[in-house]
Design a protein with these regions (language model features):
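C-terminal motif of bacterial Sec signal peptides marking the signal peptidase cleavage site
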Residues: 18-22
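Secreted glycan hydrolases and related glycan-binding modules that recognize and/or cleave
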Residues: 23-339
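Bacterial N-terminal signal peptides that target proteins for export
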Residues: 2-11
Length: 339
């Protein structure tokens, strides 16, 4: 089937064969085998496959976007064809690169924002320090307008209540708490998500994605249905049981297996090894990204047939492995067995 061949295909490489005569030093003509160009049918089938919601997806945060770099690492085009969703983490915007992966490969590209503060322009009061429903909703609409202006296909909310802000101290803001500073932060987040949900996500009736990562289960349980996916930062996960415990917390607050994506960090040394040492149910050890790809959560007393998928933070660092994106490709192939 086309779909199976698409997902299992690898980038073809130019092969040069040089034959030397055994009796003299004359070099025979160089024979170069050029990679076969992918057909229009291949790309049409690839796009159709990605439009369907019947499979686990590979999701990656892409950092250092730079199409002017010395190699392809900084380009979205370098990402394997079979990756479903790229979320831009950092870098330099390039419309041509963006539209190529969207229109040719059918890859959906979102952008990530920290969902904790509300810009002053959307705050009320004389000192612009009062949180209002109107301001929250205007902020949500402005994000959707920005998304459309730049040609993105969704928004990923980095949402980490209780965790440390890289700038120091816990993440703090009207949408994320902490509760002793913003006791109504979950109510504010509800207003924010529901307004976004009018334009993006499964409630909107559009193809635009609404994703939340970090601590998806902290939002009110009734908000889970507003998101296409929740991405848990299961960084350095040591075992299947660790993944299950993470999912249990989400399931208890309204999340379903097919919504949940488990992500490993490829920032630092993990990129070269596919993650950390991870114990499977049968006692064998594999790289943690592979463990996430193989994982199927227990839900309502039985093993799910599929989950949302798996992914990586700083996916672009897998480019340097051989072949390029080695661990990403392996994970996608494993997830093809889940239906």
């Amino acid at each position: 089937m086309y779909t199976k061949n698409i997902i299992k295909s690898f980038v073809a490489f130019t092969v040069a064969t040089i034959s030397l005569a055994s009796c003299n030093t004359e070099v025979e003509p160089l024979e170069i085998v050029k990679p076969e160009a992918k057909s229009e049918q291949y790309y049409a089938d690839l796009r159709a496959y990605k439009q369907r919601n019947d499979h686990e997806v590979f999701f990656g945060w892409f950092g250092g976007w730079n199409t002017k770099s010395a190699n392809m690492r900084g380009s979205l085009r370098s990402v394997p064809d079979s990756v479903d969703i790229i979320s831009i983490w950092s870098g330099t915007y390039d419309r041509e690169d963006l539209e190529y992966v969207q229109k040719v490969k059918g890859t959906r590209v979102t952008f990530t924002i920290f969902a904790h503060k509300i810009p002053k322009a959307f705050m009320g009061g004389e000192n612009k320090d009062q949180v209002t429903r109107e301001g929250i909703e205007r902020y949500a609409v402005s994000l959707v307008d920005t998304m459309k202006a730049y040609g993105y296909q969704g928004i990923d909310l980095d949402y980490e209540p209780g965790y440390q802000d890289p700038a120091g101290g816990p993440f703090t803001g009207p949408l994320v708490g902490p509760s002793y500073v913003y006791p109504d932060y979950r109510d504010n987040m509800e207003i924010f998500v529901k307004k976004l949900g009018e334009f993006i996500g499964p409630k909107s009736g559009t193809q635009y994605l609404l994703i939340i990562d970090g601590v998806p289960y902290d939002v009110k349980p009734e908000l889970a249905e507003y998101f296409n996916y929740g991405v848990v930062q299961a960084y350095n996960s040591s075992s299947t049981s660790n993944l299950q415990s993470r999912f249990n917390r989400a399931a208890s607050r309204g999340w379903k297996p097919e919504q949940y994506i488990f992500a490993e960090t490829f920032e630092g040394p993990n990129a070269a090894t596919g993650g950390v040492r991870h114990r499977l149910e049968d006692g064998t050890y594999v790289p943690s990204l592979r463990g996430m790809a193989e994982f199927l959560p227990i839900y309502n007393g039985k093993k799910a047939t599929r989950k949302g998928g798996c992914g990586t933070y700083h996916m672009e660092n897998d480019y340097y492995n051989w072949p390029n994106y080695k661990f990403t490709r392996q994970a996608i192939q494993i997830m093809q067995n889940h239906r």
